[in-house]
């Protein structure tokens, strides 16, 4: 159960620059890449979303938990995600991909959302580089109409849930603490291969 029922409530009761920060790059693209629970909330999602967006010259949004501990309290579920910056980007996009993190000791990317064509293409593209992709279970399926990822101009997006193990593999030393995440020299080739695979899929959609 989330501590805050919306991003509006979260922002009223926490402090920007201390508890959290927002990174946003509007590149006037028809594609937006999101890390809604970035920074220390779901580690490695910010870094991967940033890399994908940079690779494809897409719009980018990340809400980053900055606390030394307790970042999980800053998690607001995607169906209650009323951050205006993120909403504006998604509503102006034809394709949106949200990068999330989930539990799991196995290296897996669970895929969901309502953009069936892009789901198919991303699955194929990620499997081509050796990533295990599975259909997301119901509780992380990302198919709800009011999930922010699905409020695009086409009423559909893609939600990718990466297990903790897969996210660790994005870093050379397999550690995802803030110091290790923010050191780009520690980013594994998989980070860039993943981003390139995503770009290839999006360009085919």
Language-model segments: what does each one mean?
Residues 1-205:
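N-terminal catalytic or cofactor-binding beta/alpha core of small enzyme domains
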